[in-house]
Swiss-Prot record:
Full protein name: Tryptophan synthase alpha chain
Role this protein plays: The alpha subunit is responsible for the aldol cleavage of indoleglycerol phosphate to indole and glyceraldehyde 3-phosphate.
Gene: trpA
InterPro entries linked: Aldolase_TIM, RibuloseP-bd_barrel, Trp_synthase_alpha_AS, Trp_synthase_suA
Top EC class for this record: lyase
């Protein structure tokens, strides 16, 4: 089993947490990632800062600007990832970002760097499966999971293309919009997850708009994992280099809610 498959094979839903690499500075990210693990996160998503994060809401857009303003480069993100892997050999780490930093030096180079840094998976926000002749094959060839996105507009005709070649988990974006701005109705999430699970052979994690333990617990009742990003990024914005404590506190509350959600209905 891989680190990612192990994270979803614990007999309970998984908590997936996101922060932007290099926010507020490359050096400060290490302690924030450690806080996520100490708080109980099962999977870590590390954002690759980009100048035009079109799928992200204000919180993560500002995180990208802070990171880039601190001088964060792609090499810094891989350094952060490699150091994380050395400290946490069993915790899955996923890079999330946009195509430009991933393909500028070639998909094969990017995939090789992922392997060297101990990265388990990659989420590329702006390359749909129909337009991915290079990055997906390069990652799969290197043994790195390619984690695709499904949305409320992913219908039965398109879902097979999204699932083909996907591994690790499927990320269901519960709202058609940008990150962190709103949460979808619980009924629509339940319907979508049930529909996707009829075809998917990998876990389904749900994100976008999840900010509180109560929201996370509701989703965890039906999904294999819950993704939380903007709420954690907001804490980094508020506390800067001192964010590790507040991040750990919120992560612990989220983890407790997600991990116990199924017990309430058992």
């Amino acid at each position: 089993m891989t680190r990612l498959s192990n994270a979803f094979a614990k007999g309970r839903p998984a908590l997936v947490t996101f922060v932007t690499g290099g926010d507020p500075t490359p050096g400060a990210t290490d302690a924030i990632l450690d806080a996520l693990v100490e708080g109980g996160a099962d999977v870590i998503e590390l954002g690759m800062p980009f100048t035009d994060p079109m799928a992200d809401g204000p919180a993560i857009q500002l995180a990208n600007l802070r990171s880039l303003g601190a001088g964060t480069k792609t090499a810094d993100v891989f350094r952060i990832a490699a150091d994380f892997r050395a400290r946490h050999p069993e915790v899955p780490l996923v890079l999330m970002g946009y195509a430009n930093p991933m393909v500028t030096r070639g998909p094969d180079w990017f995939a090789a760097e992922c392997v060297k840094a101990g990265v388990d998976g990659v989420i590329c926000v702006d390359i749909p499966p129909e337009e991915d002749p290079e990055l997906g094959p390069a990652l799969r060839g290197a043994g790195v999971s390619l984690i695709r996105l499904a949305t409320p507009t992913t219908d039965a005709a398109r879902l097979p293309a999204v699932l083909e070649g996907s591994s690790g988990f499927l990320y269901y974006v519960s709202v058609a919009g940008i990150t962190g701005m709103q949460q979808a109705a619980q009924a629509s999430i339940e319907e979508a997850v049930a529909r996707i699970k009829q075809s998917a052979t990998i876990p389904v994690a749900v994100g976008f708009g999840v900010r509180t333990p109560e929201q996370a617990a509701a989703i965890a009742k039906v999904a294999d994992g819950v993704v939380v990003g903007s709420a954690l990024v907001d804490l980094v914005a508020r506390h800067g280099a001192d964010a590790a404590g507040p991040v750990k506190e919120l992560t612990a509350a989220l983890a407790a809610a997600v991990h116990s959600a199924r017990k309430e209905i058992a």
